[in-house]
């Protein structure tokens, strides 16, 4: 069993990112299928799908990097500011960048948001 570093998920199954096509109808994973698996802010790349159980016992498919750092779906215009859940308003973003952005706007987000630059370079290079 693998434990994700940020989310409290117990990952029980891993699939290659190429299997994402099988999930193109899945509400959240559709964002990664249509817009890619790279954080729009720091460039961190999702390379695998992990199926895990959260602390409430619910199972989810999520996108992870090689070292199981999660990518999330971000609202370009935050819901708190009237943004929708439509695909046009959603983008892939790593967990750290998404937390840093909060309910702010993309243009206000510092592109060097404390993400490990060496790790980012490693994922971009591979």
Model features per residue range: what roles?
Residues 1-30, 34-36, 43-47, 118-126:
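A boundary/linker detector
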Residues 25-71, 94:
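Short cysteine-rich loop/turn motifs with clustered Cys
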Residues 90-116:
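Short Cys/His-centered divalent metal-binding micro-motifs
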Residues 70-73, 78-99:
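Short beta-strand-alpha-helix junction that forms the catalytic/metal-binding core
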Residues 59-81, 114-126:
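Short microdomains enriched in Cys/His and/or Lys/Arg
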Residues 9, 16-20, 54, 68-75:
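A generic structural signal for ordered alpha-helices
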Residues 50-53, 87, 105-108:
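Generic domain-boundary/flexible-linker signal
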């Amino acid at each position: 069993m693998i434990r994700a570093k940020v989310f409290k998920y117990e990952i029980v199954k891993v699939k290659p990112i190429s299997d994402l096509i099988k999930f193109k109808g899945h509400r959240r994973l559709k964002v990664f299928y249509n817009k890619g698996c790279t954080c729009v802010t720091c460039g961190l790349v999702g390379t695998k799908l992990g199926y895990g159980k959260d602390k409430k016992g619910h199972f989810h498919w999520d996108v992870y990097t090689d070292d199981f750092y999660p990518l999330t779906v971000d609202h370009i215009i935050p819901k708190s500011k009237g943004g929708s859940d439509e695909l046009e308003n959603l983008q892939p973003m790593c967990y750290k960048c998404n937390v840093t952005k909060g309910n702010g706007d993309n243009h206000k987000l510092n592109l060097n948001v404390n993400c490990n630059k060496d790790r980012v370079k490693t994922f971009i290079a591979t």
